[in-house]
Design a protein with these regions (language model features):
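Sec/Tat signal peptide C-region and signal peptidase I cleavage site
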Residues: 19-23
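Lectin-like carbohydrate-binding module/patch detector with strong preference for beta-trefoil
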Residues: 24-192
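Bacterial N-terminal signal peptides
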Residues: 9-16
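Bacterial N-terminal signal peptides that target proteins for export
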Residues: 1-8
Length: 192
């Protein structure tokens, strides 16, 4: 009886350790990343003018395809530190857009689900949807049950050749509001 008890204790400890190791962040806050559709190795998620996210040819000179990945309580925010923009799930139009980083916008949070062939990107606030890359290169949010069976829902996240710019940690920071009696001021700090 004592041997079974010890065996179960050791087994429980091993399972607990494995969960803790696997739950640790795998994205370095001081690096930039490119997000590739799994079947298209020379195109990455980026944006031009406006708010639509498009596939662009990989280029280290294009800052609008470089993403810093911030972990926030098990979810992730993809932030372009050069323009302080984040990927956002527009669930009403089932589209992927970029908007200014907003710490209270849950539509900017993503679940990154690992598979053997890549990752799947699921909006954290709408887990019934999943990001897919259509054959024509359009990116859209689709019903998760349908998308999970499609290769179009697989993406690769790779470290970019572009280094993180100095001071970018401050640019990616959410806006801070300070209370001054009945007034609120944005970034009420010296030099702002």
């Amino acid at each position: 009886m004592m041997k079974i008890y010890r065996f179960l204790m050791v087994l429980g400890l091993l399972v607990w350790m494995a969960q803790n190791v696997s739950s640790q962040s795998r994205y370095d806050k001081d690096k930039l990343y490119n997000v590739f559709p799994a079947k298209v190795s020379n195109k990455v998620l980026g944006y031009d003018k406006g708010s639509s996210v498009i596939l662009k040819s990989l280029s280290k000179d294009d800052q609008k395809q470089q993403w810093n990945i911030n972990e926030l309580s098990g979810s992730f925010r993809f932030v372009n530190v050069f323009e302080d923009k984040a990927l956002r799930a527009d669930v009403d139009h089932k589209a992927l857009v970029v908007t200014e980083v907003n710490g209270s916008d849950e539509a900017q949070l993503w679940s990154i689900q690992e598979t053997t062939n890549g990752v799947r990107l699921v909006p954290a606030n709408t887990p019934s949807l999943m990001l897919v890359c259509q054959k024509d290169g359009r990116l859209q949010l689709m019903d998760r049950k349908k998308a999970e069976a499609m290769e179009a829902s697989l993406f690769q996240i790779r470290v970019s050749a572009v280094p993180m710019p100095e001071g970018a940690g401050m640019a990616a920071r959410e806006k801070v509001y300070w209370e001054d009696e009945t007034r609120f001021e944005e970034n009420k700090e010296v030099g702002h």
